[in-house]
């Protein structure tokens, strides 16, 4: 199928379930075509050393083989696959992801908890009506996301290490549904919540929205029992008493609760009761969408408001007193170079965005010291929270900044996994050249240049006589040409 396809797919490799959403873009909105969900319970396969068992990984791969069949009809640029808490935690996540990528034929991104929370919120903002100021709660298999925001804008983002699968293994391992099991699970959840409760309450909300399987299950129970859709603490306590009355997990029967959801329902319920109690939530409704919808709307660029990446870059520039004019100057030169070689090198739009982001932050190391500025820059970017960027993208930015000047460390460019190694090399070459030609820090001193790519050979053409008139510039370019040749990047300058 050609790249003009209007189909988009989002896959969420969760700790409890794997989900696939396939949609069609229709007049600036989305129409859901397919939703596939499989209980994989990946988190249950983690041992005490945080290694995933072979059985859990095989369950995951088996599910992805089903998804892969549907993905064949969709252009890879219109597919996003993200992995969350369990694969953030697992020491052997790389093994699972390598095979997952092979099965699906597209990249799998392990996203940070904050990025997961942001995407969930975006999904809610795009799909859920009601008041503008909201609190979003998503109880996953191994993490729980809590986000406040107004409109499309988040005001606080938290990803907490508790989920319905991990709490099941920890507090309901004996499969007893006793008062003491619930008490222990709720107490532990409240302790996890306590450090973030004040900030969430400070930002406040007019409406509380739940975006998880636990909340979906509650909705189904309430519908089956003829109740209204509003979830309240009173209803949660009634359901807890009903579960305790059943006595054992395998004997849990509640009207409207499906067998599929029953296993993790008590642990999810305990976490939700703790959230209601700790945050004094009056009532909650089910969200119209969450993580997968956030992914889809992000691909469609149907932003509700501003681009979070741009805001992140602006905040970092201000915080580290980066010369914004110079950052823009380098970005402009880099964008010009990129546009001249993108067809020959088959570069994608996301690569351009990441190159520009690297330009915006390239002088951040100077805030520490001129000596070893590239190393300082790489360290800062690797360790700063950068909302809007995945961990893999952060690593790529850090690697580009590490290699912005001096001899190239090729192995570092190959160790990032945001883009293919060859693309990382190409972006690095463009960044280095842009920095050199913008180094005089004045727009009128940036020469008119053409850059041509022929496979890996770059040919840079400067104005007649420029090299003669700029002896220092000539020396710097000769040195750069030599450094690039050391790593087999041919560069010719005329």
Curated annotation (Swiss-Prot):
Pfam families cross-referenced by the UniProt entry: Ppx-GppA, Ppx-GppA_III
Activity regulation note: Requires Mg(2+) and a monovalent cation, with NH(4) preferred over K(+). KCl, NaCl and NaF salts inhibit the exopolyphosphatase activity.
Family indicated by similarity: Belongs to the GppA/Ppx family. GppA subfamily.
Classification via HAMAP family: GppA (MF_01550)
Biological source species: Escherichia coli (strain K12)
Superkingdom in the source lineage: Bacteria
Pathway involvement of the protein, from the record: Purine metabolism; ppGpp biosynthesis; ppGpp from GTP: step 2/2
Entry-linked CDD domains: ASKHA_NBD_EcGppA-like
NCBIfam families linked to this entry: PRK11031.1 (NF008260)
Activity versus pH, per record: Optimum pH is 9.
GO MF annotations in UniProt: guanosine-5'-triphosphate,3'-diphosphate diphosphatase activity
A GO biological-process term: guanosine pentaphosphate catabolic process
Catalytic activity line of the entry: guanosine 3'-diphosphate 5'-triphosphate + H2O = guanosine 3',5'-bis(diphosphate) + phosphate + H(+)
Tagged with keyword Nucleotide-binding: no
Functional summary from the UniProt entry: Catalyzes the conversion of pppGpp to ppGpp. Guanosine pentaphosphate (pppGpp) is a cytoplasmic signaling molecule which together with ppGpp controls the 'stringent response', an adaptive process that allows bacteria to respond to amino acid starvation, resulting in the coordinated regulation of numerous cellular activities. In vitro, can hydrolyze pppGp. Also has exopolyphosphatase activity, catalyzing the release of orthophosphate by processive hydrolysis of the phosphoanyhydride bonds of polyphosphate chains (1000 residues).
UniProt keywords, alphabetically: Hydrolase
Protein name: Guanosine-5'-triphosphate,3'-diphosphate pyrophosphatase
EC number(s) reported in the record: 3.6.1.40
């Amino acid at each position: 199928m050609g790249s003009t396809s209007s189909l988009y797919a989002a896959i969420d490799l969760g700790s409890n379930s794997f989900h696939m959403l396939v949609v069609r873009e229709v007049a600036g909105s989305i129409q859901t075509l397919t939703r596939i969900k499989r209980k994989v319970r990946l988190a249950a396969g983690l041992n005490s050393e945080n290694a995933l068992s072979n059985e859990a990984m095989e369950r995951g791969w088996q599910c992805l083989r089903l998804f892969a069949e549907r993905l064949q009809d969709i252009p890879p640029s219109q597919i996003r696959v993200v992995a969350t808490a369990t694969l953030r935690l697992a020491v052997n996540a790389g093994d699972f992801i390598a095979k997952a990528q092979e099965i699906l034929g597209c990249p799998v991104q392990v996203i940070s908890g904050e990025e997961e929370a942001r995407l969930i919120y975006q999904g809610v903002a795009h799909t859920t009506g009601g008041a503008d100021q909201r609190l979003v709660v998503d109880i996953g298999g191994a993490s729980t996301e809590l986000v406040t925001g107004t409109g499309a804008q988040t005001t606080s983002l938290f990803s907490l290490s508790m989920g319905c699968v991990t709490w099941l293994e920890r507090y309901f391992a004996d499969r007893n549904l006793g008062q003491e099991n619930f008490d222990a699970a709720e107490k532990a959840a409240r302790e996890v919540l306590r450090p973030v409760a004040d900030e969430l309450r400070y930002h406040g909300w007019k409406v509380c929205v739940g975006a998880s399987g636990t909340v979906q299950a509650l909705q189904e129970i309430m519908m089956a029992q003829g109740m209204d859709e509003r979830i309240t603490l009173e209803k949660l306590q009634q359901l807890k008493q009903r579960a305790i009355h059943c006595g054992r997990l395998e004997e849990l029967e509640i009207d409207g609760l499906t067998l599929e959801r029953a296993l993790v329902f008590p642990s999810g319920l305990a976490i939700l009761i703790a959230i209601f109690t700790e945050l004094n939530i009056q009532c909650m409704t089910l969200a119209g969408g969450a993580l997968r919808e956030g992914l889809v709307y992000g691909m469609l660029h149907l932003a509700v408001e501003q681009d979070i990446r741009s805001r992140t870059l602006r905040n970092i520039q201000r915080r580290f007193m980066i010369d914004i004019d110079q950052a823009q100057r380098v970005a402009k030169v880099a964008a010009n170079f990129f546009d001249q070689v993108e067809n020959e090198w088959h570069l994608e739009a996301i690569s351009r965005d990441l190159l520009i982001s690297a330009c915006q932050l390239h002088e951040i190391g100077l805030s520490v010291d001129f000596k070893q500025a590239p190393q300082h820059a790489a360290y800062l970017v690797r360790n700063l929270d950068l909302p809007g960027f995945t961990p893999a993208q952060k690593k790529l930015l850090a690697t580009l900044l590490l290699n912005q000047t001096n001899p190239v460390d090729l192995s570092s460019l190959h160790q990032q996994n945001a883009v293919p190694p060859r693309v990382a090399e190409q972006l690095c070459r463009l960044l280095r050249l842009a920095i050199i030609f913008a180094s005089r820090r004045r727009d009128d001193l940036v020469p008119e240049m053409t850059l041509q790519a022929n496979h890996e050979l770059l040919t840079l053409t400067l104005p007649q006589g420029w090299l003669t008139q700029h002896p220092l510039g000539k020396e710097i370019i000769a040195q750069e040409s030599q450094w690039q040749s050391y790593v087999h990047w041919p560069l010719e300058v005329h």
